């Protein structure tokens, strides 16, 4: 009995130490739909059924400074070459019709054909547009050498129509108004005063190495044309949570242990009992969360936070 009594503390400390090491080696899932979760959530089950029918498709939003449609088009073209990318949507690749892109630049003669407006009026429009934007090529040079993005031109024409500067017949006015509604909707979705949004889709798993490599490649491609960019997606969220979770969790655990020790010391007015109680409490937490590692399962990080808070 005496020998067993002497051995028990060492066994207790050894178990706690092993639990602490194994729990730190546990693999956490940061996306609720992760396939590796032992007990899927209702959301993940529903999503899995949808994916089985329609296929998996995740979105990646790339935020870049607005105002340069040519650079945006180059970014879209370059990123689409990535094998993990399925599709891209931005103003620079949105079609106006079968022959034109919204951000494509056209001259006065092409505008006359596209909008069915008198050519001389189109020339005046281009000269007025150039003057308002401090671009005088249309005034002092050949007006047909001056080109304007379709989306900007139509916005300008609609603005002048509202001010009564331009008078068109009823059919032309209706066509311009209908097109303006479509352009406004596209700009609201994909462009603000300072930034443009390009939306890509990809099919690799959210927390896979393939997805994380794809994010690195996309950022590298975008930074070839822009000094600043933001990437937003479920994969970005999972990667950022994974990068910060370990360090933050260790800091919180340390602060919790120190705070608990301090409270127990004031309560029991001794050093031995608080240390023993903290070891018992924190040891049980470590032992509990070492089980997923031993069973080879991933633990959803929110479940870990909730359970560890309760314990």
Please give the residue ranges for each predicted region.
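Soluble or luminal CAZymes and related metallo-dependent hydrolases
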Residues: 42, 71, 210
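Conserved hydrophobic/aromatic pocket- or pore-lining residues that grip, position, or stack substrates
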Residues: 79, 198, 278
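Extracytoplasmic/secreted envelope proteins and their assembly/folding machinery
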Residues: 47, 51, 72-76, 215, ...
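Extracytoplasmic
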Residues: 86-197, 240
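Short acidic amphipathic segments
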Residues: 75-91, 228
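Solvent-exposed, non-transmembrane loop/terminal regulatory segments of multi-pass membrane proteins
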Residues: 25-68, 177-184
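A short beta-strand structural signal in non-transmembrane regions
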Residues: 57-66, 126, 134-142, 184-238, ...
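Membrane-embedded transmembrane helical bundles of large multi-pass transporters/channels
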Residues: 1-35, 206, 213-311
């Amino acid at each position: 009995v005496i020998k067993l009594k002497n051995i028990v503390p060492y066994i207790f400390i050894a178990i706690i130490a092993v639990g602490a090491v194994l729990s730190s080696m546990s693999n956490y899932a940061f996306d609720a739909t992760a396939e590796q979760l032992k007990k899927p959530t209702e959301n993940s089950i529903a999503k899995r059924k949808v994916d089985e029918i329609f296929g998996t498709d995740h979105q990646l939003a790339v935020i870049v400074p607005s105002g340069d449609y040519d650079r945006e088009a180059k970014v879209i073209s370059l990123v689409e070459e990535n094998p993990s990318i399925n599709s891209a949507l931005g103003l620079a690749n949105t079609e106006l019709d079968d022959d034109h892109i919204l951000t494509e630049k056209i001259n006065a003669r092409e505008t006359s054909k596209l909008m069915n407006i008198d050519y001389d009026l189109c020339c005046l429009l281009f000269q007025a547009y150039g003057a308002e934007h401090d671009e005088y090529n249309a005034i002092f040079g050949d007006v047909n050498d001056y080109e304007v993005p379709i989306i900007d031109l139509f916005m300008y024409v609609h603005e002048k129509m509202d001010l009564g500067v331009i008078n068109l017949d009823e059919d032309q006015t209706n066509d311009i108004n209908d097109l303006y509604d479509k352009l406004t909707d596209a700009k609201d979705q994909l462009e603000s005063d300072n930034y443009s949004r390009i939306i890509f889709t990809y099919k690799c798993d959210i927390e896979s190495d393939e997805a994380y490599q794809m994010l690195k490649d996309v950022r590298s491609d975008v930074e070839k044309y822009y000094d600043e960019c933001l990437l937003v997606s479920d994969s970005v969220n999972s990667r950022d949570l994974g990068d910060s979770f370990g360090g933050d969790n260790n800091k919180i655990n340390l602060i919790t242990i120190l705070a608990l020790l301090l409270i127990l010391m004031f309560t029991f007015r001794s050093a031995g009992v608080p240390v023993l109680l903290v070891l018992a409490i924190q040891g049980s937490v470590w032992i509990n969360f070492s089980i997923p590692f031993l069973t080879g399962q991933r633990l959803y990080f929110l479940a870990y936070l909730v359970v560890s808070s309760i314990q």
